Design a protein with these regions (language model features):
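Signature of extracytoplasmic/envelope-associated structural regions
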Residues: 1-318
């Protein structure tokens, strides 16, 4: 019964130590969950034999992968963190939420790779269930806002595999209660780029993290790696909008000079269900252009470039 899916996650007190997430307190509401229960590197034994046939192999460096999405909304109370921020983003190089009249989710910029998660999941029910458990999970996250849809976050994580999947059922979960997500539209969403209210089609923000399995004798860990010489975190994304008349707003000077500009996105109007993100460090890349319903559209990539630790993005719920 593939329609039965249970997902639990909990922040670990120390890396790789099983936090034992419980169905009563640590369940998540997710969609499009696509686990890879086991992943390995494969080493072939290069032995000579007196007959033809496949060489024996050894599966090494065991890990587990989880891809899933969550709806992007508040917790229902302005001063209460949303679980996607207090739990899931902790595995994405974020610190613990700062709680005041609203909640701020700060970027972590220390010398290590930040907090980690114990992640449990169950696919199927009685007779065909599979329980998966990973420790030390870290992950990337991509925020998606598209006009006419609800906003959501896509997570892609890797955890250390200490025990293989089994047929032990997870208890019936107590799911968190939070407001329904609201449509991205003119009534619920405001977006400005360099203080100008663009006619926005979509906005994505990718944390640019690359979770990677690292294995040595006496040490296994999921780290944030990079294969292009950049930092562990490289926040980037895409803005798709109607190109404004250049007399009203001309972005080409900022693009030409790689000049940082400000961005603000506020989604939601009801207290407890407002999500906002802002940056003064947004650098636009080279745009591409298309037409939509006889209107000129611009798709422009961007990068958030900090000039101090963790100051490239402010993420809040209120």
């Amino acid at each position: 019964m593939l329609d039965i899916n249970i997902v639990l996650a909990k922040v670990e007190s120390s890396y790789g130590t099983d936090a034992a997430p419980a169905a009563a307190t640590d369940a998540l509401i997710v969609f499009d969950w696509t686990p890879q229960p086991v992943q390995y590197d494969t080493v072939q034994r290069r032995i000579d034999r007196g007959f033809a046939g496949a060489r024996p192999t050894l599966n090494t460096r065991p890990r587990q992968q989880h891809g899933f999405s969550v709806e992007l909304c508040g917790s229902g109370t302005a001063a209460t963190p949303a679980k996607w921020g207090s739990v899931l983003l902790r595995g994405c190089l974020f610190g613990a939420p700062n709680i005041a009249a609203d909640v701020t989710y700060p970027l972590a910029s220390g010398g290590d790779d930040g907090a980690s998660l114990s992640f449990y999941g169950q696919k199927g029910g009685t007779g065909d269930l599979m329980r998966m458990r990973a420790q030390g999970q870290r992950q990337n996250a991509v925020f998606n806002f598209e006009e006419g849809n609800f906003p959501y976050i896509v997570f892609d994580g890797i955890g250390v595999l200490n025990v293989v999947p089994d047929a032990t059922a997870i208890s019936a979960p107590t799911l968190p209660v939070y407001p329904d997500p609201v449509e991205v539209n003119s009534a619920n969403t405001t977006f400005t780029l360099d203080s100008y209210a663009l006619k926005l089609r979509s906005f994505t923000l990718d944390l640019g993290l690359r979770p990677t399995y690292r294995s040595l004798v006496n040490h296994r860990e999921i780290i944030f790696d990079s294969d292009d010489g950049s930092d562990r975190r490289n926040i980037n994304g895409q803005i798709v909008c109607e190109l404004p008349g250049l007399a009203a707003k001309n972005y080409f000077s900022a693009i030409h000079g790689s000049t940082p500009i400000a961005m603000s996105l506020v989604h939601g109007t009801a207290a407890g269900n407002i999500v906002s993100m802002a940056s003064s460090k947004l650098v636009l890349g080279a745009p591409t252009f298309s037409t939509e319903q006889r209107r000129y559209m611009m798709s422009v990539p961007y990068t958030l470039v900090p000039d101090a630790a963790g100051n490239e993005l402010t993420l809040k719920t209120a």
